[in-house]
Regions:
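Phosphate-group recognition and catalysis centered on beta-loop-alpha active-site segments
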Residues: 2-5, 9-15, 19-22, 27-291
């Protein structure tokens, strides 16, 4: 879409301008966190998920300024570092998972009495999409998460402790093997529809994600077919009975009646995360409908 293309161009240009837009230091992140922790802070939106969040002008901060409670970052393992980008051509050594997400989140948690949003006691989800080399990338990610463990949700011998931030690992499926072998984890696994009803517990797979267009033909124009609506509601209710949340990607994301129609059906079915690149658009939609 044009929106995504424009953001990619901005990201690529920023990388090429040799520091014209500097990545915030921890101190700068702390200042930003303090600035946005005052009485004008937005009310958090439980269903708002920022797809490819790092393509926005201010990764993480733009989403949080709109009240989003889930953000997505794609990562590549390059020379022992986790770099955030959508494509290999966009890799920039200054745009790391730590600098764009972990450090700013920690700064906000410290500024807001242990939470990303002051007074909001649900975790904010950090969906980390490993693009390639899942095993090695996850092992490095696990190493990087540990210094931040006091703000992170964790699973110890199958028992979950919720923190201010819950990392969920998506993307390369091979990351599952080392994750399942761990007795102590600071991240969880993003399942697929085939994981519904499997032996994997919600303590390992708290989230079920799927490509909307692979399960549903309806894209918001005309009535929602009754069989597809029933399928959607059954999928969500099954996940919720298992203690799992649901997210669909590739839903319509061009502003207009079709997108609103799909989002309305997702809300009616109690889908947990609505996926968008349009932060302001989803915020307006949810604030008009969700109390």
């Amino acid at each position: 879409m044009v929106l995504i293309t424009r953001r990619r161009a901005v990201t690529t240009l920023a990388a090429a301008l040799a520091g014209a837009v500097a990545v915030p230091t921890y101190a700068q992140a702390a200042q930003a966190a303090q600035k946005h922790s005052g009485p004008t802070r937005p009310r958090p939106l439980r269903q708002a998920h920022a797809h490819n969040d790092y393509l926005h002008e201010r990764p993480l901060h733009d989403a949080l300024s709109h009240g989003f409670t889930s953000v997505e970052a794609d990562v590549f393992l390059v020379d022992g570092e986790l770099l955030v980008a959508h494509e290999p051509a966009e890799l920039d050594p200054t745009r790391t998972l730590r600098s764009l997400y972990l450090d700013p989140l920690l700064a906000r948690v410290k500024a807001n009495h242990g939470r990303v949003y002051r007074g909001y006691h649900r975790p904010v989800q950090l969906l980390i999409d490993i693009k390639t080399n899942g095993v090695a990338a996850y092992l490095e990610l696990d190493r990087q998460l540990r210094p931040y463990r006091r703000m992170l949700s964790s699973c110890t011998y199958g028992r979950v402790r919720l923190g201010a931030v819950t990392p969920v690992i998506s993307g390369d499926r091979s990351a599952r093997v080392p994750m399942e072998a761990q007795r102590v984890r600071y991240a969880f696994y993003d399942g697929r529809l085939e994981d519904l009803g499997s032996s994997a517990p919600a303590a390992f797979i708290p989230l079920i994600s799927s490509n909307w267009t692979q399960s549903f033909s309806w894209l918001g124009t005309g009535p929602f077919p009754a069989t597809e609506r029933e399928k959607l509601h059954t999928t969500v209710s099954t996940a919720h009975r298992n203690g799992q949340r649901v997210r669909f990607w590739a839903t319509p994301d061009v502003a207009g009646p079709a997108r609103d129609a799909v989002w309305s059906e997702l809300l009616a079915a109690r889908v947990d995360h609505l996926n968008t690149d349009d932060l302001a658009g989803l915020e307006r939609f949810l604030r008009a409908r969700v109390q």
